[in-house]
Amino acid sequence: MKLAPDLLQATFEQTFSILQQARRSFSPQLQPREIGTITSIATGIAKVSGLPGVGFEEILKFPSDIFGIAFNVDEDEIGAVLLGDYWHLQAGDEVERCGHLVDVPVGEGLLGRIINPIGEPLDGKGRLIASARLPIERPSPAIMNRAPVSVPLQTGIKVIDALIPVGLGQRELILGDRQTGKTAIAVDTILNQRDKNVLCVYCAIGQRASGVAKVIATLHEQGALEYTVVVVTEGNDPPGLAYIAPYAATSIAEYFMQQGRNVLIVYDDLTHHARAYRELSLLLRRPPGREAFPGDIFYIHSRLLERATHLSPNLGGGSLTALPIIETEAQDISAYIPTNLISITDGQIYLSPSLFELGVLPAIDVGKSVSRVGGKAQRAAYRAVASNLKLAYAQFEELETFASFGARLDDSTLKTIDHGRRIRACLKQAESTPISMIEQIAVLLALTANLFDEVPLDVMSQAEHAVRAATADIPVEITARLASTEKLTDEDRDGILQPVRDALAPFMHSQKRKEIT
């Protein structure tokens, strides 16, 4: 079948018209790309040339979707920190600028998830559902945007809530030698936030995989994982991931804080973070200082911990409470990193190996521990019993040391030592068993009223459990007043102590004072 000349002409004209229209409307989306080249690779870092426009801490893309951070920016060469498995990279590979800083996904979808510092899921539950992405490096709130620490954060640990109180927005350092229970205190605090409208972020920095797995299993078994985000870097991860981990975790926590929520973040631990930064700095040939740490080691921790605060009401009133953990060596709390963190934070909880060896858990040395701002947030009921308790415990520790030399002691001193031993026994607490506020106050009030003094030491644990069980008989109106800011009245004391006396009656005995030799 042959087409008529007129029809063929019309078809050509229509086709040419469409092509001309498409040509006029076409606007090529040209995107300039700046490509550099790897010149050398070392453990966790790479030297890159050919990227004259790169900025400090800008993300660089390496082959196989490996990312790095521009850490040293020189005129001719870039020192990049690698954030993934870099063993397949080699000199001569291409490197591309990404044009933005490191960011991390944030949002409600991260609750209950386990991720690494660049937002990749590690729990096998599929991709993350994020509300937004925030840079990991963010400025801390201005002074005028901060509110004083005025609301308590219950840890569920008797000795902390009574003698070393922590408030919302506070930064309380936990430090001690290896295997003294530092992580256990932080995890118990997370467990105690259940049904208290406090979200949690647990950041494991360069930890053993078995240790992190144990923490995650505890959170899961106790139902705490549902309100917790876990950010993990293991000991075999590149040092770059360990370096950015606490900053990424803080951005995740800040998202909730800016929505008016209360958030608790645990850094476990900043000793590994400091060592990772030292390793990167030495590999990048930055000048070393004390203990081979770079000169800005104080600044990297201060800018991190200054992001923890209590926002003013006009910004939503949210809070970010930080519990950084530091590992000491041979009980030396005057070392470089511990003293840096002590000066940055609002107090410290020191765990003593000596107490740990005696079976006093948590092994908190009350004399070396302090909370500089938490006392202002402590409930009045705690303040009514804490001051006398701390003084009595301090006297006991001093006299116990004196008695160890074999001196003959009078009856008054023996009584003080006996009372102190019962204070120590009552302050013991098993791991993963946070105690409610009313139960804590009942036990502490019984201590200050000397009700435990006639209870044998070998049944102190059973007697304490009986006191805690007896709190169910305390009138509801007294319990409500204890939870508020009202002071503890004499009527309230009597209402609490009456069921406590009844609970302790089966354990009472007339104990004969023994001479301590």
UniProtKB/Swiss-Prot annotation:
Query: What keywords were assigned to this record?
Result: ATP synthesis, ATP-binding, Cell inner membrane, Cell membrane, CF(1), Hydrogen ion transport, Ion transport, Membrane, Nucleotide-binding, Translocase, Transport
Q: Which InterPro entries does the UniProt record give?
A: Alt_ATP_synth_F1_asu, ATP_synth_asu-like_sf, ATP_synth_asu_C, ATP_synth_asu_C_sf, ATP_synth_F1_a_nt-bd_dom, ATP_synth_F1_asu, ATPase_a/bsu_AS, ATPase_F1/V1/A1_a/bsu_N
Q: Where is this site: Required for activity?
A: 369
Report the domain of life of the source organism. Answer: Bacteria
Q: Which GO terms describe its molecular function?
A: ADP binding; ATP binding; proton-transporting ATP synthase activity, rotational mechanism
Looking at the UniProt entry, the stretches that span the membrane are none
* Keyword hit for Membrane: yes
Spell out the subunit comment: F-type ATPases have 2 components, CF(1) - the catalytic core - and CF(0) - the membrane proton channel. CF(1) has five subunits: alpha(3), beta(3), gamma(1), delta(1), epsilon(1). CF(0) has three main subunits: a(1), b(2) and c(9-12). The alpha and beta chains form an alternating ring which encloses part of the gamma chain. CF(1) is attached to CF(0) by a central stalk formed by the gamma and epsilon chains, while a peripheral stalk is formed by the delta and b chains.
Q: Which PANTHER family match?
A: ATP SYNTHASE SUBUNIT ALPHA, MITOCHONDRIAL
Give the protein name, as stated in the record: ATP synthase subunit alpha 1
Identify the coding gene.
Answer: atpA1
